[in-house]
A protein has these predicted regions:
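Peripheral docking tails and interdomain loops at the edges
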Residues: 2-33, 40, 44-47, 51, ...
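Phospho-regulatory, Ser/Thr- and acidic-rich intrinsically disordered linkers and terminal tails
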Residues: 3, 58, 65, 76-77, ...
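A polyampholytic, Gly/Pro-enriched intrinsically disordered region
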Residues: 134-146, 184, 189-190, 234-244, ...
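Short glycine-rich anion-binding loops that position phosphate/pyrophosphate groups of nucleotides
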Residues: 146-148, 246-248, 308-309, 360-363, ...
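Redox- and metal-dependent alpha/beta enzyme cores, enriched for Fe-S-associated oxidoreductases
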Residues: 203, 250-331, 338-346
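A C-terminal functional module that forms or caps the active site or interfaces directly
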Residues: 283-286, 290-292, 315-376, 381, ...
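Short, charged, surface-exposed secondary-structure boundary motifs
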Residues: 126-128, 170-175, 225-228, 273-280, ...
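The feature marks the mature, well-folded catalytic cores of soluble enzymes
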Residues: 57-72, 78-258, 263-270
């Protein structure tokens, strides 16, 4: 009774300080008090659940008010787990929250004794560090802020995706967009990164008063309106695109796939609207120059497999190995977690200067000029071997699209029959059986 009465007095004290102007300075003190309560009470105590609710209530206030970290979902999942260690992965923009998240997980769980955060930068959901976690003895990985690109069934440890949602204000968008899109019958697409996608349906209904034709595109298996730096959608008969997010990396994938489209970016953090531009002709001319240089090295090449999480696709590796054998191209295979000039120079030696990288397709598009060697993507390797055609009108961004071609992670046997016909080299029964052993 003595502990409970002191708890009630302190609870009233917290209520009395809520309306104070400087009440924010009391939050760490309240959490320190509740930390002592957690240590003094047993997990089976009746008051534990009450203090836990109060702890969560005041812990939420230490986070930004517009961030949703799915703490209740985390709590439910932790109640079903029996491991005493957790491995966390957070994007670079959310790394400042990792201490708070580790503390709250240790408080709400009955078994967790240690929580470790990966020091490697998590660029996307393709960087799932399940192998690294297993090597250090962790059986559970909490991955924050990305969509489910890598199936949890393919991971060697239990991976739990935590979808971090960011709420934002879009009340002034109709009046601002009315100046940019003058006609009511303009066809407009709305897209965003996964953190902001939860508000897309509300934005669509909100903008329906100003525009008649609004669409939220979807590239399966991604969520409606979701955009990746390596996966976007083909746009036809549209007046423009509204992209919600910060930075240019993700939205540039739309420019690669649709060079002539009008794109307006709304940054929720700065609340600014920007009309974006992109020099697509320069990117195409660079690609053509690299492919022309690579024609001198078609007798041999090197495949470099991205080992940063799950970036590299073993299916794509098997397909380009088959294509190399079919075209009588000698190859060597290497793996690396980081692709840079130093690693390529060390690996090169007397080898060919042509490298086909199987990590992120944007490396060959954005940073090809920074490499001393020729670094091509599987799509560009297909152009080099005449397995696909490139007309210069667009660069496909469909790496995680289910309807993608042989250079994508969902490629199938049907894609191989299509690509080999382009070079008047139809697969025979012998080659078909040979390829089935690869795939």
């Amino acid at each position: 009774m003595e502990k409970w009465s002191s708890f009630r007095i302190h609870k009233n004290f917290i209520k009395s300080t809520k309306k104070s102007e400087n009440s924010v300075f009391f939050w760490p003190l309240e959490l320190n008090f509740l930390n002592k309560k957690f240590k003094s009470l047993q997990r089976s105590d009746k008051n534990f659940s009450i203090i836990l609710k109060l702890f969560l209530k005041y812990f939420y206030r230490t986070f930004p008010h517009n961030y949703v970290f799915e703490i209740r979902k985390t709590k439910k999942r932790l109640e079903c787990l029996f491991s005493n260690k957790l491995f966390f992965q957070l994007p670079e923009g959310m790394s400042r929250f990792y201490i708070k998240l580790c503390n709250i997980v240790k408080k709400i769980s009955r078994t967790i004794l240690a929580a470790t955060v990966s020091c490697q930068i998590t660029y996307g959901a393709c960087c799932i560090q399940d192998f690294l976690a297993r090597n250090f003895g962790y059986l559970i990985v909490f991955h924050y802020g990305h969509s489910c690109l890598v199936s949890i069934l393919n991971c060697i440890v239990l991976v739990i995706y935590i979808f971090v949602e960011i709420k934002y204000d879009f009340s002034f968008l109709p009046q601002s967009l009315k100046r940019l899109f003058c006609r009511r019958n303009d066809r407009i697409m709305i897209t965003s990164t996964i953190q902001f996608s939860s508000e897309l349906k509300q934005i669509k209904t909100y903008l329906a008063k100003q525009f008649n034709f609004l669409e939220i595109p979807q590239t399966k298996p991604l969520s409606p309106g979701e955009l990746l730096g390596c996966t976007s959608f083909s746009i036809k008969n549209q007046s423009g695109v509204i992209y919600i997010g910060d930075g240019r990396f993700h939205v540039e994938s739309i420019f690669f796939f649709n060079p002539n489209i009008k794109i307006i970016q709304y940054n929720p953090f700065t609340r600014s609207l920007v009309l974006l531009g992109f020099k697509f002709t320069d990117a195409v001319s660079e690609k053509e120059n690299f492919i022309e240089k690579a024609l001198f090295f078609t007798k041999s090449c090197n495949f470099i497999f991205g080992a940063l999480g799950r970036q590299g696709s073993s299916k794509i590796l098997r397909i380009i190995k088959f294509l190399s054998t079919l075209k009588k191209i000698n190859y060597s295979i290497y793996t690396t977690t980081e692709l840079n000039n130093n690693s390529l120079n060390i690996l090169s030696g007397n080898l060919s200067n042509l490298w086909i990288q199987l990590s992120c397709p944007r490396i060959s598009l954005d940073w090809a000029n920074y490499f001393k060697n020729l670094v091509l993507s599987p799509f560009e390797f297909g152009i080099l071997t005449r397995s696909t055609r490139f007309n210069g009108n667009y660069i496909p961004m469909d790496f995680y699209a289910k309807a993608g071609k042989f250079w994508t992670s969902y490629s199938t046997l049907k894609n191989i029959f299509v690509l080999t016909k382009l070079d008047n080299n139809v697969l025979t029964t012998k080659n078909y059986n040979y390829f089935k052993n690869y795939i």
